[in-house]
Amino acid sequence: MTTDTTDLELRTSRLLPASPAEVWDVYTDAEKQKVWFSILVEEPGIVRIETDLRVGGQQSAVWGPSEDQLFTEVQTFLEIDAPHRLVTESTGSTPDGQTMTTRIVVTFTAQDGGTLMEVVQSGFPTVEIRDFFVEHAWSGAFDRLAAYLTR
């Protein structure tokens, strides 16, 4: 995994063990997301995801350890070039009501028999939140995607 944290934008990537079409499908299909979202968690808790994968459509995700500790994220699809590029505007909120809106660009490029999945996310309100997404959110997502793809 490589990471560049310029200003309040992050750039991170991981080589995943599947074709771009397979990685795209696992990343964008709501039923598959429900599996990989909690694949490395001993007690998965709650995961609800609905996706309308079209420009202008939205993905709504709700997850957390219990009903009173739920995180939410609504992504609006701005650009879809399957299975190569996905651009969204993401608005997320924490259980205590804090919200944040960012722009996410994800690309899927065939490389070395797998797929280089690259993420550029911008619009973070603080360096600390950006760094959390680098160190935990995207790193964890890549780990879970890899676990799903190799199960």
Language-model features, listed with the residues they occupy:
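A generic structural signal for beta-strand entry/edge sites
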Residues: 7-9, 83-85, 112-116
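Hydrophobic ligand-binding cavity/cleft-lining segments
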Residues: 1-44
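Short, hydrophobic/aromatic-enriched beta-strand segments in well-ordered soluble domains
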Residues: 14, 119-121
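Hydrophobic pocket/interface hotspot
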Residues: 23, 27, 33, 59, ...
